[in-house]
Amino acid sequence: MRLASLAFLSLVLACAPHDPLGSPAPAPVADGEWTAYGKDVFGSRHSGLTQIDTSNVARLQVAWTYHTGELPPQVQTRGRRSLEATPIVVDGTMYLITPLGRVIALDPETGRERWVHDARIDRTIGFGDHTSRGVSTWLDPSRAVGQPCRRRIVAATVDARLLSIDAATGRLGEDFGVRGTVDLRVGLRNRPFETSEYEETSPPVVVNGVIVVGSAVADNQQIDGASGEVRAFDVRTGALRWTWHPVPQDPADPAYATWRGPNAHRTGAANAWSVLAADPARDLVFVPTGSAAPDYYGGERLGDNRYANSITALRASTGKLVWSFQTVHHDVWDYDNASPPALVTVAYGGRRRDAVLQATKTGQLFVLDRETGAPIVPVTEMPVPRSTVPGEE
């Protein structure tokens, strides 16, 4: 087992540009808008607004409060509940999703409710976590102002449904999937036995006409737990466009050899439960994957287990692998790549480079070339002691 490590981190941060990080999107996001979980599909998390600064931040007061009404005793559920949503703001409306799958549109200036779409999550099911980190949006250039679903709100629910909602009315788009919904449990390599073993807790990323979605898979349940495919669906129709397996299934894939014996065909997880990023101009989507099943024992999945615990670039239009960089080999520590990738431009070695930044649970920050996955900042592989657990290596 080996752990990849990073050198010269402080130098990268010192050399990072002070202007907004990330390449400009094809359609720049206005400063007053926040169109994705991380501001934009690049995950830049930068706002150019200047009204609040060091001279007045201490005098800020609450302007309004909105109550979702989902705390006990008003609502009872099985399992934990937490509001983790980052709202998006687009076209003068704020959109968010609650732990129980209620998508809400608010006036961002007053907090007045404009509409609510209730996905009607079964509250008797003990999901691992009742949570959702946000929603995504897409503007259909083929539809005129005032037409239904000109702008869509895309949401993935904890019970693994993909919803396409008219941003103006809160109604499901009837031309998407089955009456506005795609069942994400259909078509999995390892289908979960229980609903709570396969969930959606992060917003999908919408790029170049497709909705790309990962999944949250129950940890430490069984070797052949729910599989962690990353899939893309047509943003208009909901039709499946492609599937990528983070546990490789094709013997011709070079990564297949890093799973010894029959392990690749039965092992689950290695899923991407965090938020994805995208570079529309390069037709790339960046996928941070987690550990394979089970998390803390690798005797049933010997080898480096490549594509698990990786940051992987896929062609957004086809799902084809472009490159993959593994941050931990043969993970037995649950070192998922839990942070969303950030697409930035860094100054290093006397020149500016378009990069992907991936922060990890180990406290390391990997700085990779956006087109090749090669480390921009040198990475040193450090040997660690061999395991003494029976069956491990």
Residue spans for each PLM region:
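C-terminal motif of bacterial Sec signal peptides marking the signal peptidase cleavage site
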Residues: 13-14
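Sec-dependent signal peptide recognition
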Residues: 1-9
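Blade/loop signatures of beta-propeller domains
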Residues: 19-65, 246-253
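Short, polar loop/linker segments at the starts of domains and inter-domain junctions
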Residues: 44-56, 74-83, 257-261
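Short, solvent-exposed loop/turn elements at domain surfaces
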Residues: 35, 41-47, 70-75, 96, ...
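Acidic, proline/glycine-rich low-complexity intrinsically disordered segments
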Residues: 29-34, 41-42, 64, 68-71, ...
